[in-house]
C-alpha cells in the first residue's frame, strides 16, 4: 500500500472494469433488462451501469442455491475440503486486494487507505478464519442411558439469503458468507445498490476459487425489488441482514408472510462513549473519541456518536476533540493522505445536514463543522461536526445520524451517565474510560449493549462475537457463535 501514490490510484481507477452483471450458478449473468447507475460520491460521476435484479433474478439465484444444497457436493464435502475452498478464496481476495479496495473507495467514498488496510484485511482474515474452523466443529454424544445412544449433530440450515449495506460492503458480506459456507450452506448475496461492484467481483473470485456452481450467488438490486423477493422466497431457509432497524422490521414481516425462515438482524446504533475523570489517559480518550466518530465518515452502526463526559473534564475533552476535528484532512478518497472521505451519496449528505439543522434548532451548540466542503469537486463531502450542550431528549442524542456528527453530553454522577447511555432504543455498542476495574465491571454489566469497550474503542477479533441488544438486532456475527445462525441441531436417539 505504501508505494501507491494518489496518481497511481487515479490511473488504476481509469482502468478499472468491474463486473456489472449478476453472478448466478457459477457464472456472470450480464442481464439484458433494466440497469441502474453506480455513482461515485468522490465526484458525482457514474462509474458503472449495473444490471438491476428483481424477483426473476432472485428466483434464478435461489433456485441455483437450492440445487447446490439439495443435490450438489458442497454440504456433503468433508468439512476440511470446504475449509480449503474458503482459504483459496481468501488467497484470491488477497491477490486482488488493490482492485477491490479501489472499487470500494470509488463506490462508497471511504479513504483508499482504510479500504485497503482495514476493510480488505478484515474480509481476507474472515474467510481464512472460518476456513480453518470448518473442520473443528464437533458433534456431541451425551450419556443418556445404559441401553441407548444419543447423538447431537449440527447440520447446515440450507439456503441463506445475505443482505448487506454499503458502508463495509466486503467486511459485512464476509461475516455472513464465510460462516454460512463453512457450515455447508449455500448463499444468495444481495449487496446494497449503492456498492454492488465489490460484491459482484467477490462472486467471480468465488468461482475462480473452485466453489461449485450455485454455492455463492450475487444479485444486484434495490431493497423493494431484490431484497423483498429474497425475504419472501419460500426456498430461502435463513435470512441474515445488516442495515437499518426500519428495514430489519420488513424482513421479519417477510418471514412471517412466507415460510417462517429464520431471520438474523444486525441493525442500527446510537453508541455512548463514557469518559470518567479517572480515565488512564484523557488525551488518548479524546483522540479515540474523535477517531471513532470520524472513521469511515461516521457511517458506522457502532460509531460512538454520543460522548458522555464528566462535567469536571468536559471542557478539556471537548476542546481536544474539536482540535482534532479541525485538523482532520477531508479529501479525495483516492488520495492516501485523506483521513475522511465522501459520504455515500448526495441524498444521504442532505439527511445528515437535516440532523445538524435540527440540532441547532433544538438548542445544541455547534462547536465546529456542520457544513458541506469541497463543493467544487461534485462529491458529497461534509466537515467533521461537533455539538455540545446537547439535550438528552433531542434528535441529536436519540436518532442514528450515520455521519461524522458528534454529540457531547455532560454528566455529574456515574448513575446519570449509565441512565443517559441506556436512554435509546438501540443497544449495539458502548465505550467506557476509567482506571477503576470495579467501575469497569459495574458499568459494563449495567450497559445494555452487545459490546462494551473499556479504555479503547472499535477493537475486535474474530474469536469474539458481534451483535446488539434491544432494537439493534439479534444473533451474533463473528466467532464460533456465528455458526449457530446457519446450522440446525438434530438429535438422533438409538435404542441399543
Model-derived regions: residue spans:
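A short hydrophobic/small-residue beta-strand
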Residues: 186-188, 366, 451
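ALDH superfamily catalytic-core signature
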Residues: 238, 246-391, 454
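Glycine-rich loop-to-alpha-helix module at the N-terminal edge of alpha/beta enzyme cores
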Residues: 45-137
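Short, well-ordered beta-strand elements within core beta-sheets of diverse protein domains
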Residues: 46-53, 70-75, 162, 273-277, ...
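Residue-level signal for inorganic ion chemistry
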Residues: 44, 82, 104, 127, ...
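Conserved C-terminal structural/oligomerization subdomain of aldehyde/semialdehyde dehydrogenase
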Residues: 45-48, 236, 274, 329, ...
Amino acid at each position: 500500500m505504501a508505494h501507491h501514490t494518489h496518481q497511481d490510484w487515479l490511473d488504476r481507477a481509469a482502468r478499472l472494469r468491474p463486473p456489472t452483471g449478476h453472478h448466478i450458478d457459477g457464472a456472470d449473468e450480464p442481464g439484458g433488462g433494466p440497469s441502474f447507475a453506480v455513482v461515485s460520491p468522490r465526484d458525482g460521476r457514474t462509474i458503472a451501469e449495473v444490471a438491476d435484479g428483481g424477483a426473476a433474478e432472485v428466483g434464478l439465484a435461489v433456485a441455483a442455491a437450492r440445487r447446490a444444497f439439495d443435490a450438489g457436493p458442497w454440504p456433503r464435502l468433508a468439512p476440511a475440503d470446504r475449509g480449503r475452498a474458503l482459504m483459496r478464496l481468501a488467497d484470491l481476495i488477497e491477490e486482488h486486494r488493490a482492485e477491490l479496495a479501489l472499487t470500494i473507495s470509488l463506490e462508497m467514498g471511504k479513504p483508499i487507505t482504510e479500504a485497503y488496510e482495514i476493510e480488505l484485511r478484515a474480509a481476507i482474515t474472515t474467510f481464512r478464519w472460518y476456513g480453518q474452523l470448518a473442520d473443528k466443529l464437533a458433534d456431541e454424544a451425551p450419556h443418556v442411558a445404559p441401553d441407548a445412544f444419543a447423538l447431537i449433530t449440527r447440520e447446515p440450515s440450507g439456503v441463506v439469503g445475505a443482505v448487506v449495506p454499503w458502508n463495509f460492503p466486503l467486511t459485512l458480506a464476509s461475516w455472513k458468507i464465510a460462516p454460512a459456507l463453512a457450515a455447508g450452506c449455500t448463499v444468495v448475496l444481495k449487496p446494497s445498490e449503492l456498492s454492488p461492484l465489490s460484491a459482484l467481483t467477490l462472486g467471480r473470485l468465488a468461482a475462480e476459487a473452485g466453489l461449485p456452481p450455485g454455492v455463492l450467488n450475487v444479485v444486484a438490486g434495490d431493497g423493494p425489488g431484490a431484497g423483498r423477493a429474497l425475504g419472501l422466497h419460500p426456498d430461502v431457509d435463513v435470512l441474515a441482514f445488516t442495515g437499518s432497524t426500519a428495514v430489519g422490521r420488513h424482513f421479519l414481516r417477510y418471514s412471517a408472510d412466507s415460510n417462517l425462515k429464520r431471520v438474523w438482524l444486525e441493525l442500527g446504533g446510537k453508541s455512548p462513549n463514557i469518559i470518567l475523570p479517572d480515565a488512564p489517559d484523557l488525551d488518548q480518550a479524546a483522540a479515540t473519541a474523535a477517531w471513532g466518530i470520524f472513521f469511515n465518515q461516521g457511517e458506522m452502526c457502532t460509531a460512538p456518536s454520543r460522548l458522555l463526559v464528566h462535567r469536571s473534564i468536559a471542557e478539556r475533552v471537548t476542546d481536544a476533540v474539536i482540535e482534532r476535528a479541525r485538523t482532520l484532512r477531508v479529501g479525495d478518497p483516492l488520495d492516501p493522505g485523506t483521513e475522511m472521505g465522501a459520504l455515500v451519496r448526495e441524498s444521504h449528505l442532505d439527511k445528515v445536514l437535516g440532523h445538524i439543522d435540527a440540532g441547532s434548532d433544538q438548542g445544541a451548540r455547534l462547536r465546529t463543522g456542520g457544513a458541506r466542503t469541497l463543493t467544487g469537486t461534485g462529491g458529497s463531502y461534509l466537515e467533521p461536526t461537533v455539538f455540545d450542550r446537547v439535550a438528552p431528549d433531542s434528535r441529536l442524542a436519540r436518532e442514528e445520524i450515520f455521519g461524522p456528527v458528534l454529540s457531547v453530553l455532560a454528566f455529574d454522577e456515574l448513575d446519570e451517565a449509565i441512565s443517559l447511555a441506556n436512554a435509546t432504543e438501540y443497544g449495539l455498542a458502548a465505550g467506557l474510560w476509567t482506571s477503576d476495574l470495579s467501575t469497569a465491571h459495574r458499568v459494563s454489566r449495567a450497559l445494555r449493549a452487545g459490546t462494551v469497550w473499556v479504555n479503547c474503542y472499535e477493537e475486535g477479533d474474530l474469536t469474539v462475537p458481534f451483535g446488539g441488544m434491544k432494537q439493534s438486532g439479534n444473533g451474533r456475527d463473528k466467532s464460533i457463535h456465528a455458526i449457530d445462525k446457519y446450522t440446525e441441531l438434530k438429535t438422533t436417539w438409538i435404542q441399543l
